[in-house]
Amino acid sequence: MIIPIRCFSCGKVIGDKWDTYLTLLQEDNTEGEALDKLGLQRYCCRRMILTHVDLIEKLLCYNPLSKQKNL
């Protein structure tokens, strides 16, 4: 879905780092290097970025209103 704004454990703001993280990965950086360049040193914040699954594009393909038109 949408990247959380803050780390669930420590509360550090991480939501603004997602786009930069994706850009760094496209520049052939490893995940660890990208997280280091972003300044994410705590393992809880690193976990938030590493385990995030961006599903918003897939969910936009499903429109619940299109099924209701047939009623």
From Swiss-Prot:
The gene is rpb10. HAMAP family: RNApol_arch_Rpo10. Its main location: nucleus. GO terms for biological process: transcription by RNA polymerase I; transcription by RNA polymerase II; transcription by RNA polymerase III; transcription elongation by RNA polymerase I; transcription initiation at RNA polymerase II promoter; tRNA transcription by RNA polymerase III. DNA-dependent RNA polymerase catalyzes the transcription of DNA into RNA using the four ribonucleoside triphosphates as substrates. Common component of RNA polymerases I, II and III which synthesize ribosomal RNA precursors, mRNA precursors and many functional non-coding RNAs, and a small RNAs, such as 5S rRNA and tRNAs, respectively. Pol II is the central component of the basal RNA polymerase II transcription machinery. Pols are composed of mobile elements that move relative to each other. In Pol II, RBP10 is part of the core element with the central large cleft. Keywords: DNA-directed RNA polymerase, Metal-binding, Nucleus, Transcription, Zinc. Belongs to the archaeal Rpo10/eukaryotic RPB10 RNA polymerase subunit family. One of its GO terms (cellular component) is RNA polymerase III complex. It is found in: Nucleus. The lineage of its organism: Eukaryota, Fungi, Dikarya, Ascomycota, Taphrinomycotina. NCBIfam families: PRK04016.1. Component of the RNA polymerase I (Pol I), RNA polymerase II (Pol II) and RNA polymerase III (Pol III) complexes consisting of 14, 12 and 17 subunits, respectively. InterPro entries: RNA_pol_su_RPB10, RNA_pol_suN_Zn-BS, RPABC5/Rpb10. Zn(2+) binds at residues 7, 10, 44-45. This is DNA-directed RNA polymerases I, II, and III subunit RPABC5. It comes from Schizosaccharomyces pombe (strain 972 / ATCC 24843) (Fission yeast).
